[in-house]
Amino acid sequence: MKIINFTQYKNVYFFGDPHGINIIYDILRSYVNEDNISDNSVIFSCGDNGIGFDDIKTDSNKLKLCNDICIKHNIQLILIRGNHDNPDLYNESSPLNKSNISLVDDFTVVKTEDYNIICIGGAISIDRTDRVLNKTYWKNEGTRILDDELKEEIKSLDFNIDIVCSHNCPTYQKPKDEYPLTSDNPLFNWSIWDSKLLDDNFIDRSNLDAIHKELSMSNKIKYWIYGHFHNHYDSIESKPKFICLDMYYKNIKILKKTNNSLIYKTGPDILDIHNINKFNQIKIKEI
């Protein structure tokens, strides 16, 4: 386990799946210093950054533009891997790491002034049969199994893990895959073409069940923040509090329409850990 020390930073933010480095750039350019993200902060992306879909040089050039903004505003950007990322590019030696951008390996711990955050990437691509191996899909995309060595490293930590930042989530958190699946569930539709999908997806989320159990034995986890599901879920009474962050919407996603108003989503789903009840994405428009 690698430990990154950013204890000089108090402000901590998270956002959901950007699906592209250009979107990460747009989030940084448009939302830093706009009453959404403060300067002097650590920001976590919950995976699916689109790393590896282009060649190294192209990705590096795009990340340099992001890094320039991070330097200007004294921001440290932490990218964890999703299922739409090349896992081999997420480590301490990644050629894509920048001065203020870290593509972190699984089970990296980031220490800030108030919180210690463990990063756990990976998930199963439900549309993998429609993707190209080693270009838009990678076989080792799933959540890393918690082996004995990792268990011992977790037990040996001399500080508390306060927050889990992951791409996927345990089986008992939203969205729950209630069986038998119905045709309105994308997992069901893709499983028609992929005979191993349901089992692989269940195993992947079960890995996070085991991780949660192991972490809870020696830590008091306050929040578990994740992405992957392209929706916003917020557990009310669970401990830890589980929060799923929605993906980035370039246009709008209508949630509810009345005679007088339109409730919709747009932009990134940004979570300020010091103000967890405020989210950037949901808007109300009078009509």
What are these regions (language model features)?
Residues 2-6, 15, 21-112:
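Core catalytic region of metal-dependent phosphoesterases/phosphodiesterases
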Residues 3-13, 109-119, 160-163, 236-242, ...:
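Beta-strand-turn-beta hairpins that frame and shape the catalytic cleft
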Residues 7-9, 37-40, 74, 114, ...:
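A general structural motif
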Residues 14-17, 43-48, 76-84, 103-105, ...:
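Active-site neighborhood of phospho(di)ester-bond hydrolases with catalytic His/Asp-centered motifs
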Residues 19-25, 50-54, 83-91, 109-110, ...:
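Active-site environment of divalent metal-dependent phosphoester hydrolases
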Residues 25, 57-67, 146-153, 201-210:
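Well-ordered, non-membrane alpha-helical segments in soluble/globular domains
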Residues 76-80, 95, 173-272, 281-283:
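Conserved beta-sheet core of the metallophosphoesterase superfamily
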Residues 115-206:
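Active-site-proximal loop/helix segment associated with metal-binding centers of metalloenzymes
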